[in-house]
């Protein structure tokens, strides 16, 4: 199983728009072959160090059956459209961690 943590910095005032964009494709993504989990998350006030609340970060937590399934996910037409639409909402890019269990 492959785990993905993808964090995106959105422009101030665009977080809700970005969340709606992600929600608009979530049903399609979860139906993709090999998708185990596709969860949209945002920061909360936890009071736990070292977390710093950032209202402009959106984090996807994903699980895929294999690296091949993840790679296929990135080539599907609805993802190409998603990446195109998100350009106007994102600032500073994103970070991606692709992990496997130790």
Which role does the model predict for each range below?
Residues 1-2, 102:
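Absolute protein N-terminus
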Residues 2-9, 39-74:
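Short, well-ordered beta-strand segments in beta-rich or mixed alpha/beta enzyme
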Residues 24-27, 56-61, 77-82, 92, ...:
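Short, low-complexity, polar/charged sequence segments that are solvent-exposed and flexible
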Residues 14-40, 78-83:
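Short amphipathic alpha-helical segments
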Residues 67-91:
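C-terminal structural segments of small proteins and small subunits
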Residues 39-54, 82-102:
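Glycine-rich beta-strand-turn "strand-cap" elements at beta-sheet edges
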